[in-house]
Amino acid sequence: MLNSVSLTFPDGSVRDYDAAMTGAGLAESISKSLAKKAVAYAINGTVRDLSDPLGKSGKVEIITRDDARALELIRHDTAHVLAEAVQELWPGTQVTIGPVIENGFYYDFARNEPFTPDDFPVIEKKMREIIARNKPFTKEVWSRDKAKKVFADKGERYKLELIDAIPEDQDLKIYAQGDWFDLCRGPHMASTGQIGNAFKLMKVAGAYWRGDSNNPMLTRIYGTAWADQAQLEAYQTMLEEAEKRDHRKLGREMDLFHFQEEGPGVVFWHAKGWKMFQNLVNYMRRRLDEQGYQEVNAPQVLDKSLWETSGHWGWYRDAMFKVTVAGDDTDDDRVFALKPMNCPGHVQIFKHGLKSYRDLPVKLAEFGNVHRYEPSGALHGLMRVRGFTQDDAHIFCTEEQLASECLRINDLILSTYADFGFDEISVKLSTRPDKRVGTDEAWDHAEAIMGSVLETIRTRSGNRIKTSINPGEGAFYGPKFEYVLKDAIGREWQCGTTQVDFNLPERFGAFYIGSDSEKKQPVMVHRAICGSMERFLGILIENYSGHFPLWFAPQQVVVATITSEADGYATEVVAKLKAAGLLAEADLRNEKINYKVREHSLAKVPVILVCGKREAEEQTVNIRRLGSRDQESLGLAEAIAQLTEEAVTPDRRRKRAA
């Protein structure tokens, strides 16, 4: 063929095709059944419309509805159908943007009267009608002038702004489904009929145009869409369970923390919540000691000159909290900022004193308080805050030590997650983005090392740990590993990171003396296990639904009396429990025992020891455990021994068994 392309299929076979053949034609040439199932195709990982010509050689895949990548297409197409339905029902409504998000999509609308959930049934009915029409998605490329004229005639002023924001060298793509069309980069499935009916509108919210509070407020409609009804129902069940486990609700019930208007995005920790926080810190501190980390503490407030050197002032200034010294009338004009990250401070500590290659690796760890501005609408309990604590560490090592240090970090991260009950973990390697610092040779070297480490992680786990590569998703200063854990109801949370940094050591002139007596730049590795410790605690609260294992519970035991005649004995029991290292309190109130048990169960106390006149006489306790109706009567000494053993932390249990 004169204009042919060479395609490599997933089975490794290679065939030549006419470059003008479309993805649909390719699927048809393979089999009619595949052509019926196809919703898109991909060349070299880039998903394309079935109507697109092949155009170039590469690895090809036909995407069907059961492919994970089809979900994004289903959701994208459903967003377009939502927009068409709204404009059919309420002519004059302006459409703005409608992206795919995790587990669904949203679309922002400009309308004098905001939408409410009461509008959902009629919108969903209209959406089903549009899907049933099975109109093909067609694509055209318009000139900038034509696009602006058409959308201006339609009164779509927000689309005009979007057109102006598109770089001149990029095509303006218009996707139509029947008579309705929208400005869109694509790709889309072949027709609206391929969407199916496994979708649901979820909620409405206000959203400023372009996220700027100076712009008009729009109405955002959120929705979800899935490949089939079973997936949709499973998702709805998960949401119901997530609502029951909401850490904000459990935080109130367990008296752990609260938020208030005077401190948006910062946590007011109550005694029990702070105890839980300290339990996590103490556990992490012991794990770091095992691994040879040095715990340090860098200043909270630093001059902007340091942030300029680090690059944060240029890259991150809008998210930093700035302060001046001693008010406006001081003669000191220096500008300071609360630290958004711990890393520049750790470089200063590494630089303090001459380092030899024999001193490496140097591992500096900090439970560092950092502050980052988040829009008020983005704040969400412990999960999204403005002030939080990072379990941050930075390893300064030689290039030869990089692989072994990454593996040590990996082992620490995985064992930590296992101790907290997370055993479904995936590790993603994010590689070089388009905008980056460092030479291609340095990136090649680092990515080769981390790719080898990733393969070792996979094989050592017997393929239990899922690994993948995120092309172009690395930070501007180096490639990174992202650790994603799955919780009890199937949600995924990205927590841990291991990140190579080419940037900061060079910017700050950090060096060590090599074996040849020459100055050498160390490799710097950023490492976090929890990430934000507040967020990690929120994840733990929801994962356990407040039913913490005894070793981690902020309140382990309550001794509740049936009668005032047992008050003295209950006080003695609490004293002995505390002497054994358990967190225990007495409930001597003049209330019925069922009321006490119900109240402490709501507060998620793992163990309630009930004491009455008989228990006092026999030196026994009646044990009731959270979530169980069973009762067990044991002698006091035996009960204390049993609970003390159960409360041993996993790391101490391992050390004891070694």
UniProtKB/Swiss-Prot annotation:
It comes from the Bacteria. Keywords: Aminoacyl-tRNA synthetase, ATP-binding, Cytoplasm, Ligase, Metal-binding, Nucleotide-binding, Protein biosynthesis, RNA-binding, tRNA-binding, Zinc. Residues 1-64 form the TGS domain. Its EC number is 6.1.1.3. PROSITE patterns: AA_TRNA_LIGASE_II, TGS. It is found in: Cytoplasm. Binds 1 zinc ion per subunit. Zn(2+) binds at C343, H394, H526. Residues 246-549 are annotated as: Catalytic. It catalyses: tRNA(Thr) + L-threonine + ATP = L-threonyl-tRNA(Thr) + AMP + diphosphate + H(+). Its cofactor is Zn(2+). One of its GO terms (biological process) is threonyl-tRNA aminoacylation. GO terms for cellular component: cytosol. One of its GO terms (molecular function) is ATP binding. Its main location: cytoplasm. The keyword Zinc applies. InterPro entries: aa-tRNA-synt_IIb, aa-tRNA-synth_II, aa-tRNA-synth_II/BPL/LPL, Anticodon-bd, Anticodon-bd_dom_sf, Beta-grasp_dom_sf, TGS, TGS-like. The keyword Cell cycle does not apply. Catalyzes the attachment of threonine to tRNA(Thr) in a two-step reaction: L-threonine is first activated by ATP to form Thr-AMP and then transferred to the acceptor end of tRNA(Thr). Also edits incorrectly charged L-seryl-tRNA(Thr). Homodimer. Belongs to the class-II aminoacyl-tRNA synthetase family. This is Threonine--tRNA ligase. It comes from Mesorhizobium japonicum (strain LMG 29417 / CECT 9101 / MAFF 303099) (Mesorhizobium loti (strain MAFF 303099)).
